[in-house]
């Protein structure tokens, strides 16, 4: 009986922990129809001002040897009453492509990124990065860090 009570207690605590994980996103709005809410949790860094986060949104499309890009703008919004930022990618245009000939080369599935304004963000591990994007857009990210070495400009 005691083992059963302990097991029930552990199950209750684990479901509470799972609910607490979901509660972190409560103040953020639900995704609109046709959109997904994608969340990035960053690890804590010692000097977070020396880091940036690049949001790399895109689609996996059939592509040839040409350089391809999608167009879009990642817009920052503020959650009313909370002051938290979230980001929205409303429209994705394209793909745009260079026009090289690719004789004899088969097309293959490749991740094609969205390029435009607003994709480089300040690093803040205290809050999640919440991105609303169309359902067919995948959100990836890359961490950038500043070099310790600082160069001096030369007067000319």
From Swiss-Prot:
Gene3D superfamilies: Ecotin, Ecotin, trypsin inhibitor. Disulfide bonds join 65-102. Residues 1-19 form the signal peptide. GO terms for molecular function: serine-type endopeptidase inhibitor activity. Pfam families: Ecotin (PF03974). It comes from the Bacteria. General inhibitor of family S1 serine proteases. This is Ecotin. It comes from Pseudomonas aeruginosa (strain ATCC 15692 / DSM 22644 / CIP 104116 / JCM 14847 / LMG 12228 / 1C / PRS 101 / PAO1).
């Amino acid at each position: 009986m005691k083992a059963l009570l302990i097991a029930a207690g552990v199950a209750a605590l684990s479901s509470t922990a799972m609910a607490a994980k979901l509660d972190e996103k409560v103040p953020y709005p639900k995704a609109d129809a046709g959109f997904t809410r994608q969340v990035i949790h960053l690890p804590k860094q010692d000097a977070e001002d020396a880091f940036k986060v690049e949001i790399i949104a895109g689609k996996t499309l059939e592509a040839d040897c040409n350089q391809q890009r999608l167009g879009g703008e990642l817009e920052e919004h503020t959650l009313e009453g909370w002051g938290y930022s979230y980001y929205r990618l409303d429209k994705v245009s394209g793909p745009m492509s260079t026009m090289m000939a690719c004789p004899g080369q088969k097309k293959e599935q490749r991740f094609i990124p969205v390029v435009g304004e607003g994709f480089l963000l300040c690093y803040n591990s205290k809050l999640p990065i919440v991105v609303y994007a169309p359902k067919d857009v995948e959100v990836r990210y890359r961490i950038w860090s500043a070099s310790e070495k600082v160069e001096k400009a030369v007067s000319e």
